[in-house]
Amino acid sequence: MSSSQNNNSSWIDWFLGIKGNQFLCRVPTDYVQDTFNQMGLEYFSEILDVILKPVIDSSSGLLYGDGKKWYGMIHARYIRSERGLIAMHRKYMRGDFGSCPNISCDRQNTLPVGLSAVWGKSTVKIHCPRCKSNFYPKSDTQLDGAMFGPSFPDIFFSLLPNLTSPLDDPRT
């Protein structure tokens, strides 16, 4: 990371700007600081100090590993909140997560999904609401699937059911 990045951006700005992290949305500072949202997360006070600083502190040792996991777990909680669903809806409507590779789905927009809510089990996949299948994303991302979790598409589409239509059933 260059020194100009150190002086001009926060840890969150830096992290969200890393190639491959485009599936993530910005979690607002007030949400991150709310102790209720931090319950069960390890080392939250040390990591919180680093990720909320207005400039990156490269001497902290938390530039990527622990900060990535901590932000990812807060992100997984945030995208289930009303504000988080709105942010993810915007990204979904823009097609930020890609489209379904199944030709029958006619380039249906997809959502990120984790196959597990446990950190380190798998990388993020994309989920098509039409064919109900999961695929590897075309984008170059190695985000942990726990940043979204396995229930995110179900929650999203149960609250916003008009965003997709099922595949035509040839039997009808």
Curated annotation (Swiss-Prot):
Signal peptide: none
Disulfide bonds: none
Alphabetical list of Gene3D superfamilies matching this protein: 2.20.25.20, protein kinase ck2 holoenzyme, chain C, domain 1
Expression (tissue specificity): Probably not expressed in wild-type flies. In males lacking the Y chromosome, it is testis-specific and constitutes the main component of star-shaped crystals.
Pfam families: CK_II_beta
Gene Ontology, cellular component aspect: cytoplasm; nucleus; protein kinase CK2 complex
InterPro entries assigned to the protein according to its UniProt record, in alphabetical order: Casein_kin_II_reg-sub_N (IPR016149), Casein_kinase_II_beta-like (IPR035991), Casein_kinase_II_reg-sub (IPR000704)
Induction profile: In wild-type flies, it is strongly down-regulated by double-stranded RNA (dsRNA) interference mediated by Su(Ste) transcripts. In males lacking the Y chromosome, the absence of Su(Ste) locus, relieves such down-regulation, explaining why it is strongly expressed.
UniProt-recorded Gene Ontology molecular function terms: protein kinase regulator activity
SMART domains registered for this protein in UniProt: CK_II_beta (SM01085)
Function in brief: Unknown. In males lacking the Y chromosome, its strong overexpression leads to the appearance of proteinaceous star-shaped crystals in the primary spermatocytes causing meiotic drive, possibly by interfering with normal casein kinase 2 activity.
Assembly, per entry: Interacts in vitro with the casein kinase 2 alpha subunit (CkII-alpha). The relevance of such interaction is however unclear in vivo.
Family: Belongs to the casein kinase 2 subunit beta family.
Record's miscellaneous remark: There are multiple copies of the stellate gene in fruit fly, encoding proteins that are extremely similar, which makes their individual characterization difficult. Thus, most experiments probably do not discriminate between the different members.
PANTHER family membership: CASEIN KINASE II SUBUNIT BETA
Descriptive protein name: Stellate protein CG33246
Natural source organism: Drosophila melanogaster (Fruit fly)
Gene name of the encoded protein: Ste:CG33246
